[in-house]
Amino acid sequence: MTRVAIIGAGPSGLAQLRAFQSAGKKGAAIPELVCFEKQSDWGGLWNYTWRTGVDEYGEPVHGSMYRYLWSNGPKECLEFADYSFEEHFGRPIPSYPPRAVLHDYIMGRVEKSDVRKFVRFSTVVRWIDFDETTQLFTVTVKDLKKDELYSETFDYVVVASGHFSTPNVPHFPGIEVFPGRVLHAHDFRDANEFVGKNLLVVGSSYSAEDIASQCYKYGAKSITFSYRSKPLNFDWPECFTVKPLLTKLTGKTAHFKDGSEAVVDAVLLCTGYLHHFPFLADNLRLKTNNRLYPAGLYKGIFWQDNPKLIYLGMQDQYFTFNMFDAQAWYARDVILGRIKLPAAEERQADIDHWRGLEEKLETAFDGIDFQTEYMRDLIPATDYPMFDLDKVAALFKEWEEDKVKSIMGYRDNSYVSIMTGNKAPPHHTKWMEALDDSFDAFQNRPEAAAE
């Protein structure tokens, strides 16, 4: 029997399990599936942990989630085509839920699908290589609870371990003797740590935007952004300052490229993450920066040099959960023989075509349109339910404009579900005033949650 190893039981790995389960439910013979998950439960990054650095087994902590995290994009853009929020919760819910609510939604679909039996928890992958003679992968893993190494062979390997768990940590002169707190966003857990503090946030992408907003919400005294390539051009509150690149630190004084200075109590590095796959042999390892179309992946999924190796969710993302689904359904159908991959030359031509389109992108709207077309390329080849991609793209653009109008208030907006046609109700509490991010507090008005 064909054997498939899936590395990681986060959103991408769970999408792959769900794709096979869906085919099996319709009568298809599916391969033997083994999903290796380092954590003790599934959910990937959406699992919150208080731990930073290493876990209880001495393994690098995977999670980058923090307390009080709310979705920074409309839930309507990430909704599963085969499992709506309304189906899960029994009614429409607001457009910007907190982490616990999104986690519950993700878990709802896979629990209903009965795919937990395929997952080996607390099992970390140590090494994967490929034998050209047998055409099999050898996957060596460690059972963390038993402290035992073992190896198994597989016909296909699906790498679904994500690329937001290994921090990119630049060095700035003087940072090693800075007298305050220095941390990467990967280790950020609680905005209350910075109440009354002057915070320097290095970076200008989504994590910088979100963590800075949260620290302001919970009482930081001031926030200074330092950007390398482009600033976060929003209408920030008065206590925010935007500076060019940090050049050095002397004591508590931060020095910037334009010669200006700021006195800060803490430095938060929102400097991104690395695509890091130390468990893969060099000839199998994806090496890329965070971009919309990584080199070497046919359809953004199949390793060009060996298409029996599959990568899910390795792109920079506008679409998330439903894009992982589109990729997983496509990968499934290749494994099942429903889709025949073309020869290497044709695959490379397709990669070059998409990379050429990516090189021409100039704006966020261009990126949204690019990924929309990517989705349109994948979904019709499978039985994943098609949905109105143009409406999702329009909603992404509306979201971008909403942030420009009110970076602190955009989460109070409501949108129409592309999957059901129903509009989300407003949340009972404005985001700036919603200090409790628990599942119960979100689902119930404050007085009800307190009872």
From Swiss-Prot:
Q: Which domain of life is it from?
A: Bacteria
Induction info reads: Expression is induced by TMA.
Query: Binding residues for FAD, per the UniProt record?
Result: S12, E37, Q39, L45, W46, H62, N72, V125, Q317, T320
Report which reactions are catalysed by this protein.
trimethylamine + NADPH + O2 = trimethylamine N-oxide + NADP(+) + H2O
Residues binding NADP(+) are W70, N72, S204, S205, S207, R228, R411
What UniProt keywords apply to this chain's record, in alphabetical order?
FAD, Flavoprotein, Monooxygenase, NADP, Oxidoreductase
The gene is: tmm
Say which enzyme class the record assigns. oxidoreductase
What Enzyme Commission number does this protein have?
1.14.13.148
Give the molecular function GO annotations: flavin adenine dinucleotide binding; N,N-dimethylaniline monooxygenase activity; NADP binding; trimethylamine monooxygenase activity
| Homology family | Belongs to the FMO family.
Q: What protein does this entry describe?
A: Trimethylamine monooxygenase
**Listed Pfam families:** FMO-like
Q: Which cysteines are joined by disulfide bonds?
A: none
Q: What happens when the gene is disrupted?
A: Mutant cannot grow on TMA as a sole source of carbon and energy.
What does this protein need as cofactor? FAD
Protein task = Catalyzes the oxidation of trimethylamine (TMA) to produce trimethylamine N-oxide (TMAO). In vitro, has a broad substrate specificity, oxidizing many nitrogen- and sulfur-containing compounds, including dimethylamine (DMA), dimethylsulfide (DMS), dimethylsulfoxide (DMSO), cysteamine, methimazole and dimethylaniline.
Q: Which organism is it from?
A: Methylocella silvestris (strain DSM 15510 / CIP 108128 / LMG 27833 / NCIMB 13906 / BL2)
